[in-house]
Amino acid sequence: MPCLLPSLLRATRAALPLLSPPRVVAASASQRLLSAPAQPAASRSSMDSAEELLAPLRLAVRQQGDFVRKLKEDKAPQVDVDRAVAELKARKRVLEAKELALQPKDDIVDRAKMEDTLKRRFFYDQAFAIYGGVSGLYDFGPVGCALKNNIIQAWRQHFIQEEQILEIDCTMLTPEPVLKTSGHVDKFADFMVKDVKNGECFRADHLLKAHLQKLMSDKKCSAEKKSEMESVLAQLDNYGQQELADLFVNYNVKSPTTGNDLSPPVPFNLMFQTFIGPGGNMPGYLRPETAQGIFLNFKRLLEFNQGKLPFAAAQIGNSFRNEISPRSGLIRVREFTMAEIEHFVDPTEKDHPKFQSVADLCLYLYSAKAQVTGQSARKMRLGDAVEQGVINNSVLGYFIGRIYLYLTKVGISPDKLRFRQHMENEMAHYACDCWDAESKTSYGWIEIVGCADRSCYDLSCHARATKVPLVAEKPLKEPKTVNVVQFEPNKGAVGKAYKKDAKLVLEYLSACDECYISEMELLLSEKGEFTIETEGKTFQLTKDMVSVKRFQKTLHVEEVVPSVIEPSFGLGRIMYTILEHTFHVREGDEQRTFFSFPAVVAPFKCSVLPLSQNQEFMPFVKELSEALTRNGVSHKVDDSSGSIGRRYARTDEIGVAFGITIDFDTVNKTPHTATLRDRDSMRQIRAEVSELPNVVRDLANGNITWADVEARYPLFEGQETGKKETVEE
């Protein structure tokens, strides 16, 4: 066995002491491990060989995870914790990259061949192509449009109908105050640099990363300089505007396309801004997500549900993000379709009555603990994950199970699908638990669904901004008496003193809590006045303007600010994953490619193919087409010239699930029969023409399988009458 591995381990242990300062334990050792060549595995299994190569990387992640934990236990400065976490993420990326590099070659899709098929058969193409195209914008052709619509329809049936979710459809134009309240106006931004001569824009962190990687690949780059740059890359997500500007100067970063100087980094808001109305007085944005429309309509939705929790609302629609440098096809675009669910639930009652229906599902879970200890995702029963506390509660667990069933139903491979838990530093302070469904593609692992359990932070923000209570009422088992303390303003005196600002004062007083009111009551009794500040203005209130009222109140209901389970689906990313996971090349014929879409999402469920252009076949083509239409089966008639085998190949290439062929036996024999072909196996059966539309409908709806069809009907061996032709080339 070559001596690479022991030396690799020694290098790792030497470079990664457990309690070293974060700047010392930067990504240098990890980078060396990533670039190390894979060992030949002639004398042992490839799996054992891969695990040996991954062992030092797992060790590096585990050591850094322990280091992060110790920093937190020791209450180290936050800046040190942030650096250590950034290094942990860098090592995780190195480990994951090596895992992907070591996967079997037959597990990797031929992306170039697939993209050629997609373009040639017009699944989708760059928008405005005849004008040169616009990056990040795509038009879907007939096949892509049908596939996308079927993915959406399957989503509606799987979630909205099954869970009786309330679907709404909100406007894509959003006034600025809404997104100011949600935080998008202030925080939804990336840093951007611009070519000072031609104005070409680049995302600053991506450009800096590419530039440093290019410098590091130079053989003349010293080990010390390389280590320094690796440290910068490890911290890349944490740099602010000025730090990025300094790094661009230090490393002399230029435009990669022209070599021109670049402007200093500036924050670039990723929302498309516009103005609503002709006056230009109402700024607005194209929505960056669909969720805000659901939150704003919470009160109406709660009323529609008779005021009861839990309930869920959903929305499907386009969202917009003005990406600085969109890339990777459908994975990072500027306009995309989302499907989002907001499941509102009492935070004290997070038990789902239907959880047992998914509890026995086994799926790959990549827990936060596994990530910080360098372990891989492991298959786990969903019920066990909830019982052991890996997943926070059964409501979240139920939705993870339902997401898994949907994704596998529409064509995503279970072996290339995992659920990754957010680490503590990735979650917002108001979140309880978050999991992302991630699919393995030729681009690596990509997030396709997010599923978060969070307090309804958005509802609280919008309630404060609008003074509209966005809460539910929960009946109490027994009435309870509570002490109430509130300000009692003299509206006349306040109005006389502050006129148009009186409303501000009254709103402020109505929102004060008991503790604050008691403090101000003491000031009133001692000094006869107190001062408040609201919206940048100061107001002095005296005894004749306000008093304090104390009384008891009997409550029969209590207000509940709901928690929300929030599954958010990126339908474009799901579609791309399906394309990769279902793309195949026929064994023995490299030129014949096909997509093995499940029938439920196949663009066309069936093709109708006359054996030739013989006019005797046409009445049967018409009869079958009309019957398929009556049964709601999307189909494609291909009566063009060319051999039947070539036409089968054409329909396979766009993923048509089944094919009905009319031949001379159809014409010459009674009862009239035709063949039905399965795309994936290329096997055929023969059945009466009148039965076939119902059979295809049941196959497309998932009521029966191809195995059921083969058990019921005889396999087709070849036609018995008329001109003899080979059915498959």
From Swiss-Prot:
EC id: 6.1.1.14, 2.7.7.-
Subcellular location: Cytoplasm; Mitochondrion; Cell projection, Axon; Secreted
Protein name according to UniProt: Glycine--tRNA ligase
Disorder noted: Mice (Nmf249) heterozygous for the P278YK variant are used a model for human Charcot-Marie-Tooth 2D (CMT2D), which is caused by dominant GARS mutations. They exhibit reduced amplitudes of muscle compound action potentials and a large reduction in sciatic nerve conduction velocity in the absence of demyelination or remyelination, resulting from an age-related decrease in the number of large myelinated motor and sensory axons. The loss of myelinated axons is length-dependent, and there is a length- and time-dependent decrease in motor innervation of distal versus proximal muscles.
Entries under CDD domains matching the protein: GlyRS-like_core, GlyRS_anticodon, GlyRS_RNA
UniProt binding sites for ATP: R321, N322, E323, R332, V333, E447, I448, R573
Catalytic activity: tRNA(Gly) + glycine + ATP = glycyl-tRNA(Gly) + AMP + diphosphate; 2 ATP + H(+) = P(1),P(4)-bis(5'-adenosyl) tetraphosphate + diphosphate
Residues at which glycine binds: E289, E340, E566, P567, S568
Function: Catalyzes the ATP-dependent ligation of glycine to the 3'-end of its cognate tRNA, via the formation of an aminoacyl-adenylate intermediate (Gly-AMP). Also produces diadenosine tetraphosphate (Ap4A), a universal pleiotropic signaling molecule needed for cell regulation pathways, by direct condensation of 2 ATPs. Thereby, may play a special role in Ap4A homeostasis.
Xref: SUPFAM superfamilies: Class II aaRS ABD-related, Class II aaRS and biotin synthetases, S15/NS1 RNA-binding domain
Keyword Glycoprotein listed: no
GO molecular function: ATP binding; ATP:ATP adenylyltransferase activity; bis(5'-nucleosyl)-tetraphosphatase (asymmetrical) activity; glycine-tRNA ligase activity; identical protein binding; protein dimerization activity
Domain WHEP-TRS residues, every copy: 53-109
Gene3D superfamilies assigned: 3.30.40.230, 3.30.720.200, Anticodon-binding domain (3.40.50.800), Bira Bifunctional Protein, Domain 2 (3.30.930.10), S15/NS1, RNA-binding (1.10.287.10)
Keywords: Acetylation, Aminoacyl-tRNA synthetase, ATP-binding, Cell projection, Cytoplasm, Disease variant, Hydrolase, Ligase, Mitochondrion, Nucleotide-binding, Phosphoprotein, Protein biosynthesis, Secreted, Transferase, Transit peptide
Ligase as UniProt keyword: yes
Residues modified to Phosphotyrosine: Y443
